Amino acid sequence: VPENTVNPPPAIATRIEREQAGVGTARERDDDRDDFSHGFDWPVHGRISGQYGSQRIYNGTPKSWHSGMDVAAPKGTPVHAPAGGIVIFANPDLYLTGGTVLIDHGQGVSSNFLHMSRIDVKVGDRVEQGQVIGLVGATGRATGPHMHWGMNWLTVRVDPQLLVTPASEQPAIEAK
């Protein structure tokens, strides 16, 4: 990956901090909806290329642990909402995460999708389970096209694979 995404210069580090603060603010939303209680589906099918909790190493430099899972898929593959919810963040150009979308599933449960090549939703949109929210990409600090799926319960990271059936047992995704 480009060196300035591994060890960003001070001006870029300030931008990254500002962007991360915006994402953190979006995650503070906590309401009584229970979209999460209807279960989660895989947003994309493909080879799992990055595991939750693994040590990330870029250009030989150890970085933070991986707070989501990566699914390799061709650029332009549709990304589907894994559960219903409200879009609480959508930005096509964050420095490290590229095209980024966060969906609030209620009671502090949220999903995030990173490195998207296109975003088809905006903040405030209500999305249904299975709805296309954008397309797989390789934007931000990415080694190739994939969909990063992270889950949070407020500030606590959660492994998305705990919430879905094993990938090998998933039926084909149908666009809604």
Regions found by a protein language model. Name each.
Residues 1-52:
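Non-catalytic extracellular/periplasmic "stalk"
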Residues 41-176:
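Catalytic cores of peptidoglycan-degrading enzymes
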